[in-house]
Amino acid sequence: MNISLSDHFTYKKLLRFTFPSIVMMILTSIYGVVDGVFVSNFVGSEAFASINIIMPFLMILGAIGFMTGSGGSALVALTFGTGNEKKAKEIFSLLVYVLIAVGFLFTVGGEILLAPMARLLGADEILLPYCVRYGRIILLALIPFMLQNVFQSFLVVAERPQLGLLITIASGLTNMILDAYFIAVLRLGVVGAAAATAISQSIGGLIPLLYFIFPNRSRLRLGRTRMDFSALLKTCTNGASEFMTNISMSIVNMLYNWQLMRLAGSDGVAVYGVIMYVSFIFAALFIGYSMGSAPIVGYHCGAGNKSELKNLLRKSFRLILTFQIILTIVAEAGAPFLAGIFVRYNMNLLDMTVHAFRSYSISFLFMGFSIYASSFFTALNDGFVSAVISFCRTMIFETGAVIILPFFLGVSGIWYSIIAAEFMAVCLSLFFLIRKAKKYGYT
C-alpha cells in the first residue's frame, strides 16, 4: 500500500509511514553505541571516557546538519503543499550546496580547535591524546555526517523513507564490522573506532548525495538553483529548535562531564557515557517518529487542512504516551543487562552504572512529549516556539538542575536533574500547544 503525504492518516498508516524513520534513528543510535562497547571492553574505561569528553564538541560542529535537515525539510514539504514543486526543488538544492560549503569551513576550524577544546572540556594528560586522535579522524568525515542528517529528513519528503532505512542499515553494518575488525582484531584502539565511524558516515552521506544527483523517481533531485536568502533564513528559523537541541545537549553533556570529574572522577564520566549511549537509543524512537511525521504535518499545514492537523496531533500524542511507558519499564527492568554490555569487566563500575541508570530512566516517562511538540511546531514553520521549547528543555531546565541539585543530593542529584528538566519541558510544551491551538486550528 502506497502512502502519500496528502492521505488521511489512521494509526496504522501513521506507524507504517514513520516506521522507516524510527528504525533508521534507532539503528543509527545502536551503530554509534558500538564504538562505545568496543572501546570500553577492548581499550579501557579511560579511552571510553575520553570519547565522551570530546564528543560534545564534535556534535556542536555537526549540529548545522540537523538544523538544515529538519528546518529545510519542513520548508520544502510546505512548499510542495502549496503546489510550487519547482520552488521546492530549488530550495532543496540550495540547502545541500550551502551545507557542503559550511561543512568544509567547520572541518578546518574543528581541526585547529580540537586540542584546546579537549583541555577546556576537562581532558587531563592521560585522556587528551585519546581525545585528539579520535577527533581528528572524525572531523575528516564531518561533511558526510552533515549530509547524512540532512538526507534522512529529505528522503521522507521525497516519499522514499525506505531508501533512507536501507542506507542507514548499510552504513551501520559497515560501522559494526569495521569496529570489530579495527579494534578487536587489529587493536587500533580509538583510532580504529574513529576510522570505522568516519567510513560509515561517508557511506551514509555520499550514497543519498549520488541518488539525488542522478535522475530518480522521487519528488526531489539536485539541480540548478539560485541564492535565496529568505529560504536560508526560514530554514535556520524552522530548524533552530533542532540546532539548539544539539548545541544545548552538547553543552549540557560538557557540564555533566565537568561535574562528574569533580565529584566521581573518570569512572563517573564513564558511567554517564553508558547512560548517554543507551539513552540515545531510547530517545531515537521519539526523534524518529517526530522526524517521520513532520513532513506530513508540514504538508497539511501548507494545504490548510486543519482537521488532519488535529487528527495527527491527537494520534501522535497517544502513540508517544504508549512509547514512553514501554521504554520506562524496559529501562528499569533491563538496567543490569544494558550496563553490563559496557562495563561488566568492573563490578564497582557496573553497580554504579545500574543505580544511576535506574534513576535516570524515570525521565523516559516525559521525554517524548517535548521532543514531539518541538518537532510539531517546526513542521508548522513556527521555528520560534520550537526553539523556545528545545532551548528551555536542555539549556535552561537541565543546565539549572545539574548545577543546583548536586549541592543538595551529591552525585545522585546529577542523575535526577534530567527528570526535573523533562517534566518542566512537558509543562512548557502543553502551554504552547494550548496557546497556539486557535492560530493553527488543530483543536
Stretch-by-stretch model annotation:
Residues 22, 26, 30, 34, ...:
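Generic alpha-helical transmembrane segments of integral inner-membrane proteins
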Residues 1-18, 76-141, 187-240, 297-362, ...:
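Short alpha-helical transmembrane segments in multi-pass integral membrane proteins
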Residues 6-43, 56-71, 75, 100-107, ...:
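N-terminal transmembrane alpha-helices
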Residues 16-35, 137, 148, 171, ...:
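Transmembrane helical elements of multi-pass membrane transporters/channels
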Residues 69, 138-156, 167-175, 193-206, ...:
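Short runs within selected transmembrane alpha-helices of multi-pass transporters and secretion channels
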Residues 30-48, 118-125, 181-188, 250-281, ...:
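Helix-terminus/linker motif at the lipid-water interface of multi-pass membrane proteins
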Residues 21, 25, 37, 41, ...:
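Transmembrane alpha-helix boundary and packing residues in multipass membrane permease domains
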Residues 48-108, 145-164, 271-329, 333-335, ...:
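Small-residue-rich hydrophobic transmembrane alpha-helices
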